[in-house]
Amino acid sequence: MKIAIIQFGGTNCDMDVLHVLKDVVGVDAETVWYKEESLTGFDGVVVPGGFSYGDYLRAGAIAARTPIMDSIKKIASEGKPVLGICNGFQILTEARLLEGALTTNEYPKFRCHWTNLRVETANTPFTSKFRKGEVIKLPIAHMEGKFYAEEATLAELDENEQVVFRYVDEKGRLTDKANPNGSLENIAGIVNSSRNVLGLMPHPERASESILGSDEGRKVFESMADYITENF
């Protein structure tokens, strides 16, 4: 098993993800520069956080049009898992691998703090180690994290159980106060219709060891690794 961690100009969470995959979860992982045109030999992809190309035009817009994206789409089409974290989520929506868009926070400022999330489904390659309804704690760090989609798209995401994480309070309740960016329906993460592409704004790699304040994020990577082992 080998997982690719994609690096763009401005990516800054790649080494954190590499550490978690290799040293915490114990799987083979390797960084891949965006100019590469092939991901042959990789069984999964992580598109990490950062500020690719300075968020010019829109967050993720330039990265979504780089050479590596065709290979990421191919990986996804093969059913292999693709995980986009924060800027990675933005890139995946810009590349149309995921529905919706990430726009400027309702209160246009950078938000960096812990959030409570409710796991809406354990039926994905990334959440099999969670329980549906479980409340976990992960940090956010973004200015353009407000999830937006048309009403029909939101209804489809709900109907197909494609919403994976929602912002909640510590008791698991959906409240406006628990929503850090104004995301519609408190959405923090979604999967595609095939369920093998996940994007989320919170950072699981920053909550994968207890010394960081939470180790619940490691389950995202452990679930991903288990899925690859069982299917590829």
UniProtKB/Swiss-Prot annotation:
Active site: C86, H203, E205
Protein's job: Part of the phosphoribosylformylglycinamidine synthase complex involved in the purines biosynthetic pathway. Catalyzes the ATP-dependent conversion of formylglycinamide ribonucleotide (FGAR) and glutamine to yield formylglycinamidine ribonucleotide (FGAM) and glutamate. The FGAM synthase complex is composed of three subunits. PurQ produces an ammonia molecule by converting glutamine to glutamate. PurL transfers the ammonia molecule to FGAR to form FGAM in an ATP-dependent manner.
Enzyme Commission no: 6.3.5.3, 3.5.1.2
CDD domains: GATase1_FGAR_AT
Chain coiled-coil ranges: none
A GO CC term assigned to this protein in UniProt: cytoplasm
Annotated GO MF terms: ATP binding; glutaminase activity; phosphoribosylformylglycinamidine synthase activity
Pathway per the UniProt entry: Purine metabolism; IMP biosynthesis via de novo pathway; 5-amino-1-(5-phospho-D-ribosyl)imidazole from N(2)-formyl-N(1)-(5-phospho-D-ribosyl)glycinamide: step 1/2
Species for this entry: Methanosarcina mazei (strain ATCC BAA-159 / DSM 3647 / Goe1 / Go1 / JCM 11833 / OCM 88)
Keyword Endoplasmic reticulum: no
Keyword Magnesium attributed: no
Start and end residues of each Glutamine amidotransferase type-1 domain: 2-232
Subunit record text: Part of the FGAM synthase complex composed of 1 PurL, 1 PurQ and 2 PurS subunits.
Taxonomic classification: Archaea, Methanobacteriati, Methanobacteriota, Stenosarchaea group, Methanomicrobia
Keywords: ATP-binding, Cytoplasm, Glutamine amidotransferase, Hydrolase, Ligase, Nucleotide-binding, Purine biosynthesis
Xref: SMART domains: GATase_5
Catalytic activity: N(2)-formyl-N(1)-(5-phospho-beta-D-ribosyl)glycinamide + L-glutamine + ATP + H2O = 2-formamido-N(1)-(5-O-phospho-beta-D-ribosyl)acetamidine + L-glutamate + ADP + phosphate + H(+); L-glutamine + H2O = L-glutamate + NH4(+)
Name of protein: Phosphoribosylformylglycinamidine synthase subunit PurQ
Entry-linked HAMAP family: PurQ (MF_00421)
